[in-house]
């Protein structure tokens, strides 16, 4: 029985050594060889490495690790109390309560120091809220339509962006009133036509007098 176990262990060791030799020798004999600087470069998963291998970690990781060790070891003492809660009685309960309160005070102190704050100090400052004062104007009075008498013209004689159409308002207000009054005659086809009734009436009177 002992000899059979020894032979099986020896066979396993020889098989493991043979497998290692096979994996090292056969690829060297069958694989191709090439020389160059690119072959000597260090790469990880087919990607050429860049930068330094030493990464600068934030000090916050160090603080969190220290706090974890401290509170973890302190919480380990509570395990001893939990398995012997009946034996220690109320005295043990009061001792554990004081211990927990001490842990909470330490945690509050660490929070007050900002040890667990990951954001920079300037981002944690409360920004002043901008309060917009109500507008001191009446929107209805601004958007109401002004009559032709109230429109102000620019130097070219046009109303700048205050009328819906490009009405040419010159300094002769009376002529423009007469012209706008003529734009209310609609013919039988439904199209709006501009007819100067004063001119038409003058022409008709002249025709009658000539006849």
UniProtKB/Swiss-Prot annotation:
Topology relative to the membrane, per the entry?
A: Multi-pass membrane protein
Its EC top class is: translocase
Q: What is its main location?
A: membrane
Q: What is a single cellular component term in the Gene Ontology annotation?
A: NADH dehydrogenase complex
GO MF terms, alphabetically ordered: NADH dehydrogenase (ubiquinone) activity; NADH:ubiquinone reductase (non-electrogenic) activity; quinone binding
Give its E.C. classification number: 7.1.1.-
Residues annotated as transmembrane: 7-27, 61-81, 88-108
Q: Which reaction does it catalyse?
A: a quinone + NADH + 5 H(+)(in) = a quinol + NAD(+) + 4 H(+)(out)
Q: Give the InterPro entries listed for this entry.
A: NAD(P)H_OxRDtase_bac/plastid (IPR023043), NADH_UbQ/plastoQ_OxRdtase_su3 (IPR000440), NDAH_ubi_oxred_su3_sf (IPR038430)
A Pfam family matched by this chain, by name? Oxidored_q4
- List UniProt keywords, sorted A-Z: Cell inner membrane, Cell membrane, Membrane, NAD, Quinone, Translocase, Transmembrane, Transmembrane helix, Transport, Ubiquinone
- Spell out the subcellular localization from the entry: Cell inner membrane
* Entries under PANTHER family matching the protein: NADH-QUINONE OXIDOREDUCTASE SUBUNIT A, NADH-UBIQUINONE OXIDOREDUCTASE CHAIN 3
Purpose of the protein = NDH-1 shuttles electrons from NADH, via FMN and iron-sulfur (Fe-S) centers, to quinones in the respiratory chain. The immediate electron acceptor for the enzyme in this species is believed to be ubiquinone. Couples the redox reaction to proton translocation (for every two electrons transferred, four hydrogen ions are translocated across the cytoplasmic membrane), and thus conserves the redox energy in a proton gradient.
Summarize the subunit comment.
NDH-1 is composed of 14 different subunits. Subunits NuoA, H, J, K, L, M, N constitute the membrane sector of the complex.
Question: Which protein family is named in the record?
Answer: Belongs to the complex I subunit 3 family.
**What is the protein name given in its UniProt record?**
NADH-quinone oxidoreductase subunit A
Which species is listed as the source?
Answer: Psychrobacter sp. (strain PRwf-1)
The UniProt gene name for this protein comes to: nuoA
């Amino acid at each position: 029985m002992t000899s059979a176990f020894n032979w099986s262990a020896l066979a396993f060791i020889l098989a493991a050594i043979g497998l290692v030799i096979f994996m090292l020798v056969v690829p060297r004999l069958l694989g191709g060889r090439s020389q160059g600087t690119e072959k000597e470069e260090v790469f990880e998963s087919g990607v050429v490495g860049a930068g330094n291998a030493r990464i600068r970690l934030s000090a916050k990781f160090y603080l969190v690790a220290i706090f974890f060790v401290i509170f973890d070891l302190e919480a380990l003492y509570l395990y001893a109390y939990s398995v012997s809660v009946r034996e220690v009685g109320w005295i043990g309960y009061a001792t554990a309560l004081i211990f927990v309160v001490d842990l909470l005070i330490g945690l509050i102190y660490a929070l007050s120091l900002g040890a667990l704050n990951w954001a920079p100090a300037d981002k944690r400052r409360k920004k002043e809220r901008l309060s917009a004062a109500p507008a001191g104007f009446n929107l209805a009075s601004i958007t109401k339509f002004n009559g032709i008498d109230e429109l102000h013209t620019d130097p070219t004689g046009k109303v700048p962006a205050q009328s819906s159409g490009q009405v040419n308002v010159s300094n002769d207000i009376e002529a423009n009133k007469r012209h706008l009054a003529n734009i209310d005659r609609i013919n039988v086809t439904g199209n709006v036509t501009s007819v100067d009734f004063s001119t038409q009436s003058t022409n008709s009177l002249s025709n009658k007098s000539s006849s």
